[in-house]
Amino acid sequence: MSLGAADVGAGAGPPGQHAGAVDNWPVAIIGSGVVGADLMSRIGNGDGRLRVSAMVGTNPHCDGLARAAAAGISTSPGGVDGLLIMPEFANIRLVFDTTNPGARQSNWARLADTGVRMLDLTASAIGPCCVPAVNLDAQLDAPNLSMATCSAQAAVPIVAAVRRHGVVRYAEVVSAIASQALGPAERVTLDEFAELTTTAVQELGGARRAKTLTIVNPADPPMPMRTTVFCLVDQADEVARIEADVLAVVDGVQALLPGYRLKHRVQFERLGSGNTLYIPGTGEFGGTRITVLLEITAAGGYLPACAGNVAIVTSAAKATAEAIVEHHAQTVKAEL
């Protein structure tokens, strides 16, 4: 892949101190593994709102640092401490943390007082949780944003769409992710990611209760990520409108990641006498079960097609960063 050079723009001041509206922000990526490399490729050659000025990691021999260096991007194997002493850091406006749960606290601790913004792709919950298709506008001024998990990025917009038409008494999210698309760090944090997804489905999606299941799919050749979202609602009298809203949010997420799509039409099943379900912590339920089947493919970028779990988070992070830049430009313009 070919990425253009990302040299620092002339005349840029310290982080957070630019006097005028900024059309193109220099950013840094912490973490040179698969996630960081994919994010770098999605940002591209700097002809949009973002340009990668630095990438740092801890493995000097990893592919991500080699690709960044070949693209003219400054690199360091010194991690966040290496970033802080790079000449380019003086102009960095925003940092993406793509490392792992073990490093996320220390990375933000080192950067919190520098004035840079951070988008955390490790699902750390240090900052507010962000699903750009649902709650981006409310988070644009936060110094640290935690990108929701891959399952939450896929499912929360669906639950929120159903919630517009009534109370979602229970939502269940079942994601099957290719074994080849999960690294060692992700495998040991599956339970934590499930908890974070459940919280996002409730707090951002609006479900009263929720549950998340993650299945590691060993199929070879590997399959794309597939997420099934179940919503239990008392009534679903507006079937056509619910389906239309679900289709609209799918289109919205597709704008961020073209590989996000409905696998089948939205399904509605009436549950009644002799055909009820049990909601944990609530009891017997008779109403309507809405089922949405999604497939997430890593369209474009650095990843194989099966790694939709990574692509949906890097795509969401890129879109969030671009919105932050636009929001900052509009805010500065309004103050002039």
UniProtKB/Swiss-Prot annotation:
GO terms for molecular function: acetaldehyde dehydrogenase (acetylating) activity; NAD binding. SUPFAM superfamilies: Glyceraldehyde-3-phosphate dehydrogenase-like, C-terminal domain, NAD(P)-binding Rossmann-fold domains. It comes from Mycobacterium marinum (strain ATCC BAA-535 / M). It comes from the Bacteria. The active site is at 150 (acyl-thioester intermediate). NAD(+) binds at residues 32-35, 309. It holds the Pfam family AcetDehyd-dimer. Keywords: Aromatic hydrocarbons catabolism, NAD, Oxidoreductase. This is Acetaldehyde dehydrogenase 1. The gene is mhpF. SMART domains: Semialdhyde_dh. It is an enzyme of class 1 (oxidoreductase). Its EC number is 1.2.1.10. Signal peptide: none annotated.
